[in-house]
Amino acid sequence: MKIIREAMAGTLESSDVMVRIAPAEGPEHDLLIASSVEKQFGEAIRQTLLQVLQHYQVEPVQVMVDDKGALDCVLRARLETALMRACDNGQLPWGAPNENAE
């Protein structure tokens, strides 16, 4: 998936997360995480972001996260929404690829 514009999703309310994405200049994803629970869950947040980016085969992108204690499912949903808003086709390929499809 190619990111062509900046996009964001989420709020700064308690138990939510604001995710902003933009095309990256370098060869790797650039993850910038600010979280009220970073000491406890910083690595889990990073892994969730990387899993979603890998699942959708996103080209190098900058992801800025301002977390206020959001659950994993909220983080995933906010990132998926930001990806949809930033990509050129306007929709995500939901579900896993079906290898047996003809």
From Swiss-Prot:
Q: Name one GO cellular component term.
A: cytoplasm
SUBUNIT field: Oligomer with a subunit composition of (alpha,beta,gamma)6.
NCBIfam families assigned: citD, PRK13253.1
Q: What family is reported?
A: Belongs to the CitD family.
Where is this protein localized, as stated in its record? Cytoplasm
- Main function: Covalent carrier of the coenzyme of citrate lyase.
Keyword annotations for this protein?
Answer: Cytoplasm, Phosphoprotein
Taxonomy of the source species: Bacteria, Pseudomonadati, Pseudomonadota, Gammaproteobacteria, Enterobacterales
InterPro entries annotated for this entry?
CitD (IPR006495), Mal_deCO2ase/Cit_lyase_ACP (IPR023439)
What is the protein name stated in its UniProt record?
A: Citrate lyase acyl carrier protein
Give residues where O-(phosphoribosyl dephospho-coenzyme A)serine occurs. S14
| Protease among keywords | no
- Whether Phosphoprotein counts among this entry's keywords is yes
According to its UniProt entry, this protein's organism is: Serratia proteamaculans (strain 568)
Top-rank taxon, per record: Bacteria
Fetch the Pfam families from UniProt: ACP (PF06857)
Q: Which gene encodes it?
A: citD
